[in-house]
Design a protein with these regions (language model features):
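Secreted/periplasmic carbohydrate-active enzymes, especially glycoside hydrolases
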Residues: 1-171, 175-179, 214-216, 231-232, ...
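Substrate-binding/catalytic cleft of secreted carbohydrate-active enzymes
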Residues: 146-149, 156-360
């Protein structure tokens, strides 16, 4: 018998519908796909289609929207029938939410969640662990870092040049935190102009290198598409391996119109995508502003604090500014936070503090 091989969920809060695309290893016109939507144990919506046609589900009038403040998830039950015979059934989940941008009354383009302005604020999270490096010791450790991030008052995480295991994204969905997903950097560094729009010559990757980038970036988006927490795709960081920026930004937006595209965090800057992303250390500074896109501070901070027995290299402390006491570090953090607060009405729509773990 045939089976379900993949599902892809796309919410549309403006039309109050959920689209579920179901892939199977065969397709026959007599096959039927049925999707049931549950809120807890209660069946709240369902839809049916012929195998190969997306299932469009009208959601209830009192639909619950997903947000960091209220991360409402709906459970899904997806069934594949051959004629009237059930041949496969899988369970999943989805959320109703929308990421977009909109010009506010002062003419500044703002990030929006569910059609409401939202300042997105979170740490640069490179996903490092003291023992396993890129591998977390256990599932609880993944949860701990995300929960701590929320406890600190953040509503977003910039997942920096790393793709996490599926469990991590599920925890973000359940706990309620928005994710900016970076493409891991590759190839070489071209010229980097971070303080103005790029006027240099972009790097040309080899045919093989470009093909690898495009293949892997598509695979990342395919793999993570149905996680509601992901709000922004970030194809490049600080010019590393950056090439054909407007084309890559446009491809990303067309391939997944449900997310925002931050073309190049920290430059090189182009007038494409949904955001202009500045990096400035150590304190926040808005040295460039884009009237057509959301202007964001993609990295700042980097306050280092020496903690005995918490150092990877005991003789080398990390940080753009370094302190020896918790009070000094906290005071500096608050100083930067107050500077940032004053820059929000002037144009910043998001900020990323460096960083969750003290790595380079």
């Amino acid at each position: 018998a045939q089976s379900i091989t993949n599902i892809k969920t796309t919410p549309d809060i403006d039309l109050n519908k959920l689209t579920v695309e179901v892939a199977t290893d065969e397709k026959k016109l007599s096959d039927k796909i049925e999707v049931k939507v549950f809120d807890g144990k209660e069946l709240v919506a369902k839809g049916v289609s012929i195998n190969g046609i997306p299932v469009e589900i009208a959601m209830p009038a009192d639909v619950k929207l997903w947000s960091p403040e209220s991360p409402s998830l709906y459970d899904l039950e997806i069934s594949l029938f051959e004629g009237n015979k059930l041949v496969d059934k899988v369970k999943s989940y989805a959320a109703m939410r929308k990421f977009s941008t909109k010009r506010d009354k002062n003419g500044i383009v703002r990030l929006q969640l569910n059609n409401k302005d939202q300042f997105q604020f979170g740490p640069l999270d490179q996903g490092w662990w003291p023992d396993g490096l890129y591998t977390a010791p256990c599932d609880e450790a993944l949860v701990y870092d995300i929960q701590k991030t929320k406890d600190f008052g953040y509503n977003m995480i910039r997942k920096h040049i790393k793709v996490e295991p599926a469990r991590w994204y599920t925890h973000c969905d359940r706990l309620g935190i928005i994710v900016w997903q970076d493409m891991p950097s590759g190839d070489k560094n071209p010229e980097w102009q971070m303080r103005e729009y790029f006027t240099g010559t972009e790097k040309k990757r080899s045919t093989e290198s470009e093909a690898t980038y495009r293949k892997e970036w598509k695979e990342i988006i395919d793999c993570l598409y149905s996680y509601p927490c992901i709000g922004t795709w970030v194809p490049f960081n600080e010019a590393w391996g950056q090439f054909k920026t407007p084309e890559i930004a446009e491809w990303t937006k067309q391939y997944d119109p449900s997310r925002l595209v931050n073309p190049a965090s920290g430059g090189n800057h182009y007038t494409c995508g949904d955001m202009l992303d500045l990096h400035h250390y150590p304190g926040p500074e808005m040295f460039l502003y884009d009237a057509q896109r959301a202007t964001v501070l993609g990295e700042y901070g980097g306050i280092g604090l020496v903690l005995k027995e918490h150092l990877w290299e005991p003789d080398r402390n990390w940080g753009y500014v370094q302190f020896n006491t918790s009070k000094e570090a906290t005071d500096k953090y608050m100083e930067y936070a107050n500077v940032l607060k004053e820059l929000i009405p002037r144009g910043f729509s998001a900020a990323v503090y460096t960083q969750t773990t003290d790595v380079g």
